[in-house]
Amino acid sequence: MNMIQNILRVILGSKFERDLKKLVPIVGQINSLEKEMKETSDSLLSSQTQKFRERIARGESLDSILPEAFATVREVSLRTMGMRHFDVQMMGGIALHRGNIAEMKTGEGKTLTSTLAVYLNSLAGKGVHVVTVNDYLAKRDANWMKPIYDFLGISVGVIQHDMDHEQRKIAYSADITYGTNNEFGFDYLRDNMVSHKDHKVQRSHFFAIVDEVDSILIDEARTPLIISGSSDETTDKYVRINKIIPKLVAIEDFEVDEKARNVLLSEKGVSHVEEILGIENLYAPENVDLVHHVHQALKAHKIFQKDVDYVVQNGEVIIVDEFTGRLMAGRRYSDGLHQALEAKESVTIAKESQTLASITFQNYFRMYDKLAGMTGTADTEAEEFRKIYDLDVIVIPPNVSVRRKDSPDRVYRTEKEKFDAILAEIRELQSKKQPVLVGTISIEKSEILSKMLSSAGIQHNVLNAKFHEREAEIVANAGKPGAVTIATNMAGRGTDIVLGGAQLYKENLETWKDDDDLVRRFKESILKQELDNAELLIREMDSSVKQKRASEILESVKIWKKNHEDVLVAGGLHILGTERHEARRIDNQLRGRSGRQGDPGSSRFYLSLQDDLMRIFGSDRISGLMKWANMPEGQEIESKMVSNAIARAQKRVEGHNFDIRKHLLEYDDVMNRQRIVIYKMRNEVLENEDISSLILSFIEEAVENQIVAHCEGNNPSSWNLDSLKEWLEGLELNLEINEEDFKKTKNPQLALFEKVNAAAKQKYEDRAESIGKDIWKLLERNIFLDILDHRWKEHLYSMDHLREGIWTVGYSERNPLVEYKLQGFRMFDVAIENLKNEVVNFLFRVEVSENSKLPEERREYKKVGQEVTGGFQELSSGTPSPTVTVTTSSGGGTERKTSRRRKR
């Protein structure tokens, strides 16, 4: 296979070369328009948007106007922000517009690149979503690029976590909407829980650009978005189960699989658990929940580590994002795992949750007509992007060649030897004033290293989840001469480290609102680094206040420039990795913090055979080699065999994680098909004021099912008419049925069906007439939605339990996924049938009181249930719905009550 690929590469060129050949001619067309755009007045340039929209309305495609639209954005960006898109950014914009992932290195200007495709696609008028990893970046990027969009008459909205319904609706109605993957996903789920179509906030899913696409579509794809409500189950079981875990013996009672992050009970362990709990059979059907909780408690104790996977703060277990190192306050693991951790840490245990709505990021983002993404590191996951999302990765060349020097890994036998070598390296770097960014993969390791540096008298900053509020300040100082910064996972940080430290003078210039000619020229001189000219302009200023402020800015620039030059001489920012991450691209993201925009830089990773990656996935041969070589303590090894073993280990982990994500998707695809049916049915009810045809089809189906169940065949003598009459009485439908009436008919069963169906339909129409058409229409829609939501909630609960226990079929050599599909679809069919029957039964019995009025539509917005992101939860309140006073017959009497959408 490799030989064939090599031959094709020689004949056709590499994929990178082929991709560039397609992009270069279009960039040429854009560049040919630059002179014309420069000569265009502001008013004519801003009117381009209207002209483009008129051309699209006449049938012209977005592709045909791309060169002009991109050239327009480039010129507007230059006029409003002083930033001109490079040719490589044009290539990135084309790749995004075509629905690809643009891989662009750190510092290449992905945010500015996105404006090209965002503007072009916004012209279609269907809304463009720009997806970021956190609220801060969504707001920052929207505000940063807003001058371009404002000039062109394009509206911009930003979704933030604490926004209410009206604010969200306004943001989504804009041409461009910035927000996080979580907010977009949860808004979609909430839109499918509303009681009126006007309560929805999202429009169509037309085009989305996902920033840090690998972080969102790969790293966060293993766990779903869930909206949940609290369960009625007690928390006592978690305390009870937690007490037995310390009594179990490793290897004897259970085996820890670190590769799969799982714990397996042995047969002896099962017997031991049964003995401690005083039960006969742990795997009896009534103990399915017990098995699940024992398993989760074992994982909590043996897999999940404090200060690595979570921290305990103020009596709460708070999750640490494994990819960004940030605390995820308010988020909870699902499936009882968070409660197991709370029991382990002896803090207050919250009640377990019940799923009300859920979707994976894979299935959410696959809904978009066109999807694109940006990142600095996607090529290593190209296969997964192609197979799961049908996205091609286009590698965009850097505007300036990368000058960073990446040195080979240094490998040591023990972690202590590795840390000693790291300490010596940091000392040497600091002595020559070279800033160093030290990357760790956990809070625990960052704190160990911090203590070592403090003991050695080395000043440093620590950036991990515990110091999250100081992130901006720490990153701003990380590029100063001799700065030492320890960071836990730099993925999704979204901030560049500037050599010499942050250019604080730029912020000072922006906040200086004086706009006379001298001040304006002074600002231009500072930005162009023409410091001598800036000094002359200060002397010409007519105000001592202005002179003082300008002098302070100039001094700030001189200090930064000196620091910048010192760092350049020292070799730029040095990246020191203390451990390899499971995924190669996370290592590449850390490396990518250095050498931005042609800056000098360097990187090296320090490893030990005791690192998790090497210990769990590495080869025993490496350890054997080092022992055989009788290496002295502290001696490093640099060898091709070791490097290859590390690469193989990372590929194995990446493959394993891909399988987990694929496995999750296969299970969610079962739910997704069912979700599509339910949401489609729900939307039909929301979109149509009159759903009588749907209800009549339910009535017909209910009648048919009852006749098939009680009156099978064409022999009236064998029919169970008493059961059929009992069902009809339940619907308050008094219908004379005698078997003699049907014996002489050609098709007795069909005749019976036609008679009962006609009577049922007439009863339905009579009720609508007597109650009043307007109230009846509203009533049946509200009742339908109430029952639909209730049945869907119960079905999700059943599916959760099915999935928890489905793995046991593996013991009988059946495929758990196949069984899950079969049983899941059977359960779904039953749920749909129950839904239809319940709607019919309720509508035939409900009565509206004389004094009831048409309910007013409520437009207030409240979050429903709890949001669970990536298996993490957030508590919120229920949404009230319109009320109608009704009377429901029950046996011989009546019961007056208020029909209100049930709180979940």
UniProtKB/Swiss-Prot annotation:
Entry superkingdom: Bacteria
Biological process (GO), any one: intracellular protein transmembrane transport
Organism: Leptospira borgpetersenii serovar Hardjo-bovis (strain JB197)
GO cellular component: cell envelope Sec protein transport complex; cytosol; plasma membrane
Protein name in UniProt: Protein translocase subunit SecA
Single annotated GO MF: protein-exporting ATPase activity
Job description of the protein: Part of the Sec protein translocase complex. Interacts with the SecYEG preprotein conducting channel. Has a central role in coupling the hydrolysis of ATP to the transfer of proteins into and across the cell membrane, serving as an ATP-driven molecular motor driving the stepwise translocation of polypeptide chains across the membrane.
Alphabetical list of NCBIfam families matching this protein: PRK12904.1, secA
Subunit structure: Monomer and homodimer. Part of the essential Sec protein translocation apparatus which comprises SecA, SecYEG and auxiliary proteins SecDF. Other proteins may also be involved.
CDD domains with a match to the protein in the record: DEXDc_SecA, SF2_C_secA
Cell compartments where the protein resides: Cell inner membrane; Cytoplasm
Gene: secA
Enzyme class, broadest EC rank: translocase
EC code: 7.4.2.8
